[in-house]
């Protein structure tokens, strides 16, 4: 598995999981599951056709790339629900004050994480912080 990860590269889903796992003690797999739909929405500006191809191969509904990407992220959220994986950091139980106190540190260090360089869309500290906030509150990524 490690060889596959090394060859595939991982992107900001893992960058976030590394840093929030360390701060909030979220198991890595659970963190990745929570973050994946948000990261797909963030990345779709850079690679929506690729995500749409995945959705098509899964026979998900949609005519446009945006509709197909939405179907893909909805499917992931439904899978998470079926396994009792929370959809947000707030639902996971991360205290809001603790989150606010840590988000700058997490965002900055997630940008510096080794996995960030392989993400299909570049991201800076401010965008990473905003993405974290969307993940905490469950807001649809719109930037």
Q: Where are the model-predicted features located?
A:
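Active-site segments that bind and position negatively charged phosphate/pyrophosphate groups
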Residues: 1-78
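C-terminal charged capping/lid subdomain of soluble metabolic enzymes
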Residues: 51, 61-143
